[in-house]
Regions:
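Thiol-based oxidoreductase modules, predominantly thioredoxin-like and allied folds used
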Residues: 34-45
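Local sequence-structure signature of Cys/Sec-based thiol-disulfide redox active-site neighborhoods
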Residues: 1-27
Length: 82
């Protein structure tokens, strides 16, 4: 069985789009095939500078896959392609 994809969500508190992406990832995680973690960009000045105006940003296996919005079907398609 292949290793699950690694998904990282870069977000910040008070970001409603981030909350939407988190809800989608939590819902889809039960299907398997990926694990995910969240990084608060405001906890690291370098990340804050890099992603300040782009959150939420989603990386799949180290490659940027989405920023701002992420639809469930697009995520599943991207997950399968990586």
């Amino acid at each position: 069985m292949p290793d699950p994809r690694q998904v990282v969500l870069y977000s910040r508190k008070g970001c409603h789009l981030c909350d939407q992406v988190k809800a989608t990832l939590s819902r889809l995680e039960t299907r398997g095939g990926f694990t995910w973690s969240e990084v608060d960009i405001d906890s690291d000045p370098e990340l804050q500078q890099k992603f300040d105006q782009e959150v939420p940003v989603v990386f799949i296996n180290g490659k940027k896959a989405f920023k701002y919005r992420m639809e469930e079907r697009d995520f599943l398609r991207a997950l399968g392609a990586r």
